[in-house]
Amino acid sequence: TLRGLDHCLKAGLLTGVATSVCQTNIGELLTESWLRELIQRGVHYVWYHTYRPVGPKMNPALALRPEQLVEVRKFVVEMRAKVPIAIIDAYYDHQGQALCPMSTGISHHVGPSGGIEPCPIIQFAKEDIRDPRGVYVAMRDSAFLKDFRELSARETRGCVVLERPDLVKELVVKHGARDTTLRGTAMAELDAMTPRFSQWLPGEEVPEKHWMYRLSKKYWFSDFGAYRDVAHDAAGKARQLQQRLAATAPSSQTPPTS
């Protein structure tokens, strides 16, 4: 809440606002006025991530269309060069090429129960932070995490969960990974998913404009060679994307004849 935000700022905490952009809020969040309001309140950074329809109450109707994903990216790049507030994203390198932090090894996720998961929306684990070997060794030597990184990097520069939930299920079954949710329905939720586009949209890359983001991403948030030896079918993906964009574009109206 805004009141909670004010309390954090008054306490002198490094404070940011993370937003899950979806169909019902994209028009309000992708505005310079919203960022200016946060700056006026003293917020240090904002984080735009896009809604991913996963979990027990997934709502595909809220997910952004491919052209809206591009719109979010363009807005972030433009505002980074215009307004005095840090803007975080986790999906692109300095050239605007898509990447997945899990695939590149930048991050994994520790769930509430202590399970070391590939990423926040893959709620399965083999290892635990209570591993007597220590967290570092448990993550470094995990065949489960290694296979996930390699599978994801091999299949897409985007989100393997959104694009290929079937492969996620296969890998979970292969390793006998446990469901880390309290509800115990993560596998059924994977089965219920429909493949969709994620941040990998070949031909729609938007490079960073601001020198600071361009340099920092180039050296500290790159793909670290995860995709170096992978020949993705970017041309095929681009064709699929253009077909999708053409199918969803508003049709031109023929003017009435007198």
Q: Model-flagged regions — what are they?
A:
Residues 223, 234-258:
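Long, low-complexity, intrinsically disordered segments
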Residues 28, 35-37, 58, 63-68, ...:
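Solvent-exposed, non-transmembrane amphipathic alpha-helical segments
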Residues 2-99, 103, 112-113, 117, ...:
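Radical SAM enzyme [4Fe-4S]-AdoMet core and its adjacent flexible, acidic
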Residues 141-220, 224-229:
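Cysteine/selenocysteine-centered motifs that mediate thiol-based redox chemistry or coordinate metal-sulfur cofactors
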Residues 67-95, 120-174:
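C-terminal accessory region of radical SAM enzymes
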Residues 6-9, 143, 219, 245, ...:
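Generic low-complexity, intrinsically disordered sequence content enriched
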Residues 22, 31, 65, 91, ...:
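Alpha-helix initiation/capping motif
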